[in-house]
């Protein structure tokens, strides 16, 4: 977050983007994103992505793109637009766009309010992008155009995921839960039921991840704590769940008697 904040504070150009150093980008990504912004008069642009490991690439899951509108002059809904809170909900709901910053470009002028620049939260290892995007879009008129074409290649580090599974609850886990809880509290003023359902679903997934870890590691004390938190969340509406993910969730739900 420190590097991103310094970059934003020192930037003098018209556009801002944030690419992760270990990922790959398509040769035309920024030309296509900026062209889409200029043609459709939006404040930002977002493209689809593909995940890759040493074994090859894996497409970002195609979403229904619910709640976005076909942009002017677009073909087969290749480019679509929306703005404000609706845009943030698309990031949360559609897996191929995602609540991250690395597949997006912004006009520098929209990344500030009367209070100053929108800076990333310090000392947060997971969820800082989502929280930042909420500030930029929720309750504001910031517009975005979506390009369904995958132009960004995100490196999926499966070895790191395996490592964190072995070491139990991590800072990533705690940050993810905290960010969802804070966002849920923050967006109440918007009185948007669907947004709250989306964040509640993401909180459920974050807590369920910790509960599974505690169960596998026989960490009784933490299991009881997070199991109670999971029960307090209660029934949730699911979003963007694949068949395999649904089966796995239902198996764990039955095991933990959450149904």
Over which residues does each language-model region extend?
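Long, charge-rich low-complexity segments
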Residues: 179-197, 248-259
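Amphipathic alpha-helical repeat scaffolds of TPR domains
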Residues: 200-212
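Generic structural signal for well-ordered, non-membrane alpha-helices
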Residues: 178-185, 205, 228, 232
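Nucleotide-sugar donor-binding/catalytic module of glycosyltransferases
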Residues: 1-178, 182-189
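Residues within HEAT/ARM-like alpha-solenoid scaffolds
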Residues: 171-175, 194-202
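Membrane-interface aromatic/basic loop that binds lipid-linked glycans or pyrophosphate carriers
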Residues: 76, 213-259
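Short alpha-helical segments used as structural interaction elements across diverse proteins
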Residues: 1, 101, 197-199, 245, ...
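Secondary-structure edge/capping motif, primarily at the C-terminal ends of alpha-helices
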Residues: 187-190, 210-218
